[in-house]
Curated annotation (Swiss-Prot):
PANTHER family: MALIC ENZYME-RELATED (PTHR23406), NAD-DEPENDENT MALIC ENZYME, MITOCHONDRIAL (PTHR23406:SF34). The active site is at Y104, K175. Keywords: Metal-binding, NAD, Oxidoreductase. It catalyses: (S)-malate + NAD(+) = pyruvate + CO2 + NADH; oxaloacetate + H(+) = pyruvate + CO2. The gene is maeA. NAD(+) binds at R157, D270, N418. This is NAD-dependent malic enzyme. A divalent metal cation binds at E246, D247, D270. HAMAP family: NAD_malic_enz. Homotetramer. Transmembrane segments: none annotated. GO terms for cellular component: cytosol. The keyword Nucleus does not apply. GO terms for biological process: malate metabolic process.
Length: 565
């Protein structure tokens, strides 16, 4: 449902002159009216012409097109964001297809690697282990009092790039940009945070420009005590905030999620957001290929926290579709670098133990090896769906894809690893190896594939289709927790907007131009489920929709009135 157009009320602010021009959330630049220029001591500080935001956005678009590399475009957009946030979001929303890969994946990966080199202006909060005893003071220094969404990272597992130390701050900044651009959450309500606990990246430690704490990463009790201090300080400062964990290492991601998801409204996008968008994609792809997800056999390459999180949510969804838990688990096969996860495999991680196959059930498999490779698994399972979350390029070989297609006329193949350089196989190859029959969704953006004069659009299985709507739904409903059922309702709603399902052609996921509409629909479904689950106060459907509309921020300038501090 589109939000009703409502007249924006005037905003009363105490700032004036150069201070106002340096305030990104309030700066209008050349769009300040003549009356505002007189009232806020801006006469002579700006060119004569008063422009509209669209005129400003057109100039910015022309300037943007003058940059030749993606990282230079990223730097330019970040500069606008740090100068005039309203203009930044108007520009991004005008060109979302072009700019989303620049402000987030894959370009944000390079921005994280070069964070200290391209650093220009502070954004967000940097909390180093050295300052752990000043946690409350640090959060009190945040000028925005009504923070509603925090994205926090410790920089240890940035995309597929590993430990980027303080450079990981690029991820919370980019993620929150999408909360606003796609989910309509006001930038005034968002806060990016990096927990600087050191780095084990020797290249960063040797870099004279590196801006983080030059120390090996703290671990074990020291690490968990530090994170706990942060969580308690956040609860004290903003008790109703939504906290998103982002790009934590596998060894910490699941323990932190399990420890805090029932203590503070929180979720891990790498685990739960990735799972939700993947399940939504699979529901739609299964319907397009014929049948339900519960009828499909699924093989994973990659059994880390993200892969296992997706697998568990698939199992939950197939149970909703009528399978028993035992039957649902028998349809999911997890392969890591040591082969298929079985009950005879040593040193399994806690979250892997429920996803093993019983070795005794594999006695009739066609294989000569004790280690069951991906090819062995594909040959014997004959899967309908192949999902890659390995972070390693090229592992979906031609032999594996052709073997899958031999037994599955309409295979669903999802190489989800980020960034583009880590993808398990390119869509071009997958389409060619399956004679144009595969349904493909990727983690990074890819151009449409042309094969034998036919165009195949490639859906990006982008978490941005999920987490902004979840955030908006949590804020609008006042949810105190994010439950598994809320995430599954987001997946089901996303699947309902699949052009391939609705029209029989096109992308398996919605186009980016529709992402705000999808986010609002997900917000409603999430808010409604939160009420049903008892983690939000029950209201009428009309009241929930009104709350979503009221909280949906638009990139428009408001009229300013002068007031004293």
């Amino acid at each position: 449902m589109e939000p009703k157009t409502k007249k924006q009320r005037s905003l009363y602010i105490p700032y004036a002159g150069p201070v106002l021009l340096e305030f990104p959330l309030l700066n209008k630049g050349s769009a300040f009216s003549m009356e505002e220029r007189r009232n806020f001591n801006l006469l002579g500080l700006l060119p004569e012409v008063v422009e509209t935001i669209e005129e400003q956005a057109e100039r910015a678009w022309i300037q943007y097109q003058g940059f030749k590399t993606e990282i230079d475009k990223h730097i330019y957009l970040r500069n606008i964001q740090d100068t005039n946030e309203t203009l930044f979001y108007r520009l991004v929303n005008n060109h979302l297809d072009e700019m989303m890969p620049v402000i987030y994946t894959p370009t944000v990966g390079a921005a994280c690697e070069r964070f200290s080199e391209i650093y220009r202006r502070s954004r967000g909060v940097f909390i180093s282990y050295q300052n752990r005893h000043n946690m409350d003071d640090i959060l009190q220094n945040v000028p925005n009092h009504n923070i509603k969404v925090i994205v926090v990272t410790d920089g240890e597992r940035i995309l597929g790039l590993g430990d980027q130390g303080i450079g990981g701050m690029g991820i919370p900044i980019g993620k929150l940009s999408l909360y606003t651009a796609c989910g309509g959450i006001s930038p005034a309500y968002t806060l990016p945070v990096v927990l600087d606990v050191g780095t084990n990246n020797q290249q960063l430690l040797n870099d004279p420009l590196y801006m983080g704490w030059r120390n090996p990463r703290i671990t074990d009790d020291e690490y968990y005590e530090f994170v706990d201090e942060f969580i308690q300080a956040v609860k004290q400062r903003w008790p109703d905030v939504l906290l998103q964990f982002e790009d934590f290492a596998q060894k910490n991601a699941m323990p932190l999620l399990n420890r805090y998801r029932n203590e503070i409204c929180s979720f891990n996008d790498d685990i739960q957001g990735t799972a939700a968008v993947t399940v939504g994609t699979l529901i739609a792809a299964s319907r397009a290929a014929g049948g339900q997800l519960s009828e499909k056999k699924i093989v994973f390459l990659g059994a880390g926290s993200a892969g296992c999180g997706i697998a568990e949510m698939i199992i939950a969804q197939t149970q909703r579709e009528g399978l028993s838990e035992e039957a649902a688990r028998q349809k999911v096969f997890m392969v890591d670098r040591f082969g298929l996860l079985t009950d005879k495999m040593p040193n399994l991680l806690p979250f892997q133990t429920k996803l093993v196959q019983k070795r005794e059930n594999l006695s009739d498999w066609d294989t000569d090896s004790d280690v069951l490779s991906l090819l062995d698994v594909v040959r014997n399972v004959k899967p309908d769906i192949l999902i890659g979350v390995s972070g390693q390029t090229g592992l979906f070989t031609e032999e594996i894809i052709r073997e899958m297609h031999k037994h599955c006329p309409r295979p669903i193949v999802m190489p989800l690893s980020n960034p583009t350089s880590r993808v398990e196989a390119t869509p071009q190859d997958i389409i060619a190896w399956t004679e144009g029959n595969a349904l493909v969704a990727t983690g990074s953006p890819f151009n449409p594939v042309v094969w034998k004069d036919k165009i195949y659009p490639i859906a990006q299985c982008n978490n941005a289709f999920i987490f902004p709507g979840i955030g908006l739904g949590v804020i609008a409903s006042g949810a105190s927790r994010i439950t598994d059922e809320m995430l599954m309702s987001a997946s089901e709603t996303l699947a309902q907007y699949s052009p391939l399902v609705l029209n029989g052609e096109g992308l398996v996921l919605p186009e980016l131009k529709d992402i705000q509409k999808v986010s609002r629909a997900i917000a409603f479904a999430v808010g409604k489920m939160a009420q049903q689950q008892g983690v939000a106060v029950k209201t009428s459907a009309e009241a929930l929709q009104q709350a979503i509309d009221d909280n949906f921020w638009q990139a428009e300038y408001r009229d300013y009135r002068r007031t004293s501090i």
